Each structure stands twice: as C-alpha cells, then as structure tokens.
C-alpha cells in the first residue's frame, strides 16, 4: 500500500552486486570458479507477488564444470568435398533423366529410341559449365592440398605442382571453351540467367565481412566530393573489400581447419568479446551454408530447365521438388561439416559463461530489491537488476550479458543446450527421408523412382552420421549433468 515513509520504515540500500573490475582473470582448465559476492543487502517484503530476490550476502556465483566430450572422427576436407560433389552430381543426373527421358520400351510402331535418354538434345557445354560450378569446392580443396608449404621431398613437390597445374589448366580450359560456345549459341538473357548468381555471391558474403579492420565504410562515409569522383580510390577500396571477403571465405570454406578456441575466463568484458567473435564466426558459417546450398540447387534444378526448348515437355512439379530436396540436403550436409560437435560444444561453453536475463513486469516486483546493472559485474542466478528503465531477472549460472541486448538473448537461447543444433539437423534430415520414402512408395513413374532411390542413399549417410553424433554426445552430456547438479546443491 502506498504511504509516506515513517520513522519506523526500514530503508534498504541499493548497492550494486560487485564493484566494477572485481571479477576478472582467466583460467585454462575446464572448471571455472568465481568469488563469493559479499555485498550486504536485504530484500523487501514481497506482498504476494510471487517474486523474490535472494539475499546477496549468501549468494555465490556457481562454478561451471564444462563437460569433456569425446573426440568424434572428423572427415577430411577433400573427402567431404568429394562426397558433396558426388551427391550433387547424382541430383544433376536424375534431373537430366526427368528432362530428357525417352519411351524406349515402346514397340517399333511408335517413335523408337534405343537409349533411355535423348542424348542429342543435351547441350554438353552447358553440362560442363554446370559440373564445374558444382565442383568448385572440390576443385578448390584439391588445389589447397596441392599447395601445402613445408619441408617436402623433391619428388613430392614436383608431384604437387603437376597436380595443381593439371587441375587448374583442365578446369580453366574446359570452362573457357564451354563459355565461348554458350556465348555464340544463346541469347544474352540466357547467359545472364546462367551467370548472375555469381554476381550476388561475393556481395552477399561481403555483408558479414569484418569491415572494421579495413575501415572501408568509415572511409567511404568521410569522403569528400573530390575524393568521391576518384575512380582509383574506389577501385582500390573495392579490391580491398573483395580480398578481405575472399580471404575470410576461403578460411571458412573447409570447416574444421580453422576452428576457434574457448577462453574459460571470468572477466565479463572478455566473455562478451568472445561471444561477439563467436557470433560473427557462426553467422559467417551459416551464410556459407545458405549461399552454397542455394547455388547448388539453382544449378541443379533451374539452369537445365531454362535452356530446354519450348517444345520440349518435362515435369515442372518434379523440378521444383528437386530444388527443395537438393537445397535442404545440401544445407544439412554442409552444416554437419561446418558445425561439428567440438564447435557446438564451444558455443555451449560461451553461452554458459554469458548467461541470460528474463524481462520482468515492474509492477510484480515493486517491493523486491532491484540492483542497478553494471557491466563489470558477474551476477548470480535469481538476482533482479534494473537496466534501461526495465527490470530483469538473472537466469543462468553466470550472467554477464547485457540485459537489453537481443543478440545475447538469442545466443544463449540457441546454444545453452549443447544438443539443440544437432537435434534440429536430425529432425530436418529425418523429415526429408520420410518424405522421400513416401514419395518413393507412391511414385508410378520410372524416372522418379530411380531419382528418389539414388538421392535417398546420400541422405542415409548424412542421417547415420548425425544419429551417431547425437547418441554419443547425448551420453556424454548426461553423464556430466549429475556432477553439476551435486555442485549446484553444494553451493546453494
């Protein structure tokens, strides 16, 4: 009830949980510890609101014990790219069956055909360009493996040089020869449809490039009228941006080769900096997955259809269905490679250190002690803080996140449970397999039966690896959950 503060009304202090700079340092072990918060404060009496802020003098930031997961086998980059290229070739092959199938089983009274495909209608130059585009990652992995630097024998260095020279020469010659033929045969609109995804490839990936290092946007924003006219400066800035984008793209192209590490520290500012870096790295990997999967599905499902003659009949519904199947399957395979178990565990550790805040209605906690949030404090679980005229409740064991930062909340939501990404991939791949099995049983056309049967094999292999990782990691995290509960009860 409202009223004037009388002489017998108790006044409570609103000191912060810890002084700025009191929580710092780092530890390289798997167990993190934090000092006991010893600020004296008492909670106000709660008038039936159901919310309470625990006495901070008895609160302890519970130490985290990170789970040691087993090292699961990671597929080599060149083998993974070969597997992905083989799956895309299968999808391209079954689409060509859908487009150029024949009626070879008809009697001679009908238009006969001695082959199952109309090979005379297939443009092999277009097929060559499509194959090179689909195999760009595999070609890049071969060149990278053949460009290894170090102490190698003379025979091995000559062999690597010949391999790199042969692959690049054969790819460049085949691509140039096929493109010249296509430029002479088709219209400008067809060629634009063929090549325009590459015009969006670098700019799309460039959006996530760390341009703060190059200060490109700051430089462009501060340019005067005379500098803006200078074409040389623009070209240099654009080339610099392309170089940084391509460097980051090639670093992430082969997944586990460049895996970030986790610094198990107690400094709130360092924890937030680590989370920002991991967010950038994760967004880049997801962008690589999105671009690669859409590009593969585009060249498998849409490009062959666009260059078909108007008088030629094909199943348009099956082409659209194949586009969805290829894009989803490629996305799952790439995410499984770019987001391995060790990387998901790293994100989980960072989310556990970051913590999370839950927004609370101020009317429900008007009689509960609310501490002003400070960025250098490590807040224990259950504490109420006031930030930006709102009230938040600490949810995690460690809580160093900014309460009003939505990106911190999303990061903790996705990665607080280490198996969440793996479960999503497993459910998605399982749904695709169930749909393909249903389509296979209900299919009445021979080319669709062959297509679904071939595509299913690649999805079976991806599903097997996901299920294996899920079972192994599920056991590992369940074993580590019981000691953590005992530790929580000991400090509570």
From Swiss-Prot:
Residues 28-53 have a biased composition (Low complexity). It is a multi-pass membrane protein. Its main location: endoplasmic reticulum. It comes from Homo sapiens. Residues 1-54 are annotated as: Disordered. PANTHER family: FI21814P1, TRANSMEMBRANE PROTEIN 39B. GO terms for cellular component: endoplasmic reticulum membrane; membrane. The chain crosses the membrane at residues 77-97, 115-135, 153-175, 185-205, 288-308, 322-342, 421-441, 447-467. The keyword Transmembrane helix applies. The keyword Heme does not apply. InterPro entries: Uncharacterised_TMEM39. Belongs to the TMEM39 family. Glycans are attached at residue 8. Disulfide bonds: none annotated. This is Transmembrane protein 39B. Keywords: Endoplasmic reticulum, Glycoprotein, Membrane, Transmembrane, Transmembrane helix. May protect the cells against DNA damage caused by exposure to the cold-warming stress and facilitates tissue damage repair during the recovery phase. Pfam families: Tmp39. It comes from the Eukaryota.
């Amino acid at each position: 009830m409202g009223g004037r503060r009388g002489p017998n009304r108790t006044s409570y202090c609103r000191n912060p949980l810890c002084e700025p700079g009191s929580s710092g340092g780092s530890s390289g072990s798997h167990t993190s510890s934090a000092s006991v918060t010893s600020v004296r404060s008492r909670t106000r009496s709660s008038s039936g609101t159901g919310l309470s802020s625990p006495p901070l003098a008895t609160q302890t930031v519970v130490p985290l014990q990170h789970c040691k997961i087993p090292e699961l086998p990671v597929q080599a980059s060149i083998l993974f790219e070969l597997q992905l290229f083989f799956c895309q070739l299968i999808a391209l092959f079954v689409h060509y069956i859908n487009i150029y199938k024949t009626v070879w089983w008809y009697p001679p009274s009908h238009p006969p055909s001695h082959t199952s495909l109309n090979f005379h209608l297939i443009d092999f130059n277009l097929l060559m360009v499509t194959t090179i585009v689909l195999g760009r990652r595999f070609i890049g992995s071969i060149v990278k493996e053949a460009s290894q630097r170090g102490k190698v024998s003379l025979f091995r260095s000559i062999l690597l040089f010949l391999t790199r020279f042969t692959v690049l020469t054969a790819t460049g010659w085949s691509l140039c020869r096929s493109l010249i033929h296509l430029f002479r045969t088709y219209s400008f609109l067809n060629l634009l449809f063929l090549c325009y995804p590459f015009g969006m490839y670098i700019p799309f990936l460039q959006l996530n490039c760390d341009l703060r290092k190059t200060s490109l946007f700051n430089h462009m924003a501060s340019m005067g009228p005379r500098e803006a006219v200078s074409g040389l400066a623009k070209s240099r800035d654009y080339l610099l941006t392309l170089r940084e984008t391509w460097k980051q793209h090639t670093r992430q192209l082969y997944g586990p080769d460049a895996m970030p590490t986790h610094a198990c520290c107690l400094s709130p500012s360092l924890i937030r900096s680590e989370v920002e870096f991991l967010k950038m790295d994760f967004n880049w990997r997801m962008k690589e997955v999105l671009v690669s999967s859409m590009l593969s599905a585009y060249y498998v499902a849409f490009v062959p259809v666009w260059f078909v003659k108007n008088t030629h009949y094909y199943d348009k519904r099956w082409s659209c269905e194949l586009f969805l199947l290829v894009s989803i399957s490629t996305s799952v395979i790439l995410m499984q490679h770019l987001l391995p178990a060790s990387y998901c565990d790293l994100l989980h550790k960072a989310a556990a250190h970051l913590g999370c805040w839950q927004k609370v209605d101020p009317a429900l906690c008007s009689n509960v002690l609310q501490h002003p949030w400070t960025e250098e404090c490590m807040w224990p679980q259950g504490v109420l803080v006031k930030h930006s005229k709102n009230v938040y409740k600490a949810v995690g064991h460690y809580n160093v996140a900014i309460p009003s930062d939505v990106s911190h909340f999303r990061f903790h939501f996705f990665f607080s449970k280490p198996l969440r990404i793996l479960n999503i991939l497993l459910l998605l791949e399982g749904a695709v397999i169930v749909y393909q099995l249903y389509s296979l049983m209900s299919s009445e056309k021979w080319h669709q039966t062959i297509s679904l049967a071939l595509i299913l094999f690649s999805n079976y292999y991806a599903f097997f690896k996901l299920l294996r990782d899920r079972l192994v990691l599920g056991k590992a995290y369940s074993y580590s959950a019981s000691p953590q509960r005992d530790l929580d009860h000991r400090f509570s």
